[in-house]
Design a protein with these regions (language model features):
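A conserved ligand/cofactor-binding region detector
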Residues: 1-325
Length: 325
């Protein structure tokens, strides 16, 4: 294919080496993004229907510069030369509501080519200056309350936009009989950042589509899958209840209710108080997102076989004992 591409470009008077001059967008190259990109590339190459969702950040990691012999970090506007690969879908924008303000999520679609063309959909936050901060920086500082709330807003923003789209599209095609939803969809959670999507899935099913809570939880447990990216307990995401209640009170209520269901189930299974505490989704005024993912997801894995074994035998050993399947 390389030679064919060179030949086609040469016919147009273009040297393929000019592509070496294109700056890479500084949007990160860690394990999370690499695995997501591999998922998308592989699925398109195999002809499988798989679409990705995320945030369309205005700025990347940072732009390095030197001033008086010292490094300074400047915002990296990766879109300064335009973004020819993304298509803005103004017709599919939607509102995402927080307790204190509402944000408009505008999708931008990027094609992923293979045996079929799949889609990477990235949401851009628009509205007030405050709202637009949600999609401004890739990794905002979270050493302050304001920074922590911004991280939480980011996670809910794209998760809520994604779940709302999936459910709306399903209802348009199949009506409000959600029994076949898990047969037609798998929602893959890439680490704990989008795990709040579980609570939003249940919230929409109960509040908007009038499904019983038990039914919504059952559908979630048949739909979601979770890939863990860290074996360090201190790196697993958790949120103090004050933050969640402040901007997402309905989500806080859903999380508490899921925890009650989980505790009842685990008590009936003969778990000790210590085991239940280790698997708690809500405990000591804190929400534990990894425990939520492990309880709800129909499958849990690491990024490698050894990683998965560590999850089974160490990090989530108690949960694996109760839910070995």
């Amino acid at each position: 294919m390389l030679n064919e591409t060179k030949s086609i470009l040469a016919e147009k008077g273009v040297d393929i080496n000019v592509f070496e001059e294109i700056e890479d967008a500084a949007l990160g190259n860690g394990g999370l993004g690499r695995l997501a990109a591999c998922f998308l590339d592989s699925a398109a190459g195999l002809g499988l229907p798989l679409h990705g969702y995320g945030i369309r950040y205005k700025y990347g990691l940072f732009k390095q510069a030197l001033e008086n012999g010292c490094q300074v970090e400047l915002p990296d506007d990766w879109q300064r030369f335009g973004d020819p690969w993304s298509l803005r879908r103004e017709d599919e924008k939607r509102e995402i509501k927080f307790a204190d303000y509402t944000v408009t999520a505008v999708p931008y679609d990027m094609p992923v080519f293979g045996k079929r063309i799949n889609r990477l959909r990235l949401f851009q936050a628009e509205g007030s200056e405050q709202a637009e901060k949600i999609s401004e920086y890739l990794y905002p500082a979270d050493d302050t309350e304001e920074g922590k709330l911004l991280r939480l807003r980011q996670e809910y923003f794209f998760s809520a936009a994604t779940i709302a789209e999936l459910l709306e599209n399903y209802v348009k095609q199949h009506g409000r009989n959600f029994g076949t939803f898990p047969k037609l969809h798998v929602i893959q959670l890439n680490d704990t950042h989008p795990v709040i999507a579980i609570a939003e899935f249940i919230r929409l099913l109960t509040a908007k589509y009038r499904q019983p809570f038990a039914t919504a939880l059952s559908l979630a447990r048949q739909t979601f899958a979770y890939t863990n990216h860290t074996v360090l307990p201190e790196a697993l995401e958790c949120w103090h209840e004050d933050y969640v209640k402040k901007i997402l009170p309905d989500i806080a209520d859903i999380l508490v209710k899921i925890n009650i269901y989980a505790m009842r189930e685990q008590t009936a299974a003969g778990c000790t108080e210590e085991e239940i505490a280790k698997m708690a989704i809500y405990n000591d005024k804190t929400f534990f997102m990894a425990n939520l993912a492990v309880y709800v997801a129909k499958s849990v894995n690491g990024v490698a076989k050894l990683h998965t074994e560590i999850l089974k035998n160490s990090l989530f050993a108690t949960a694996h004992k109760i839910y070995p399947e």
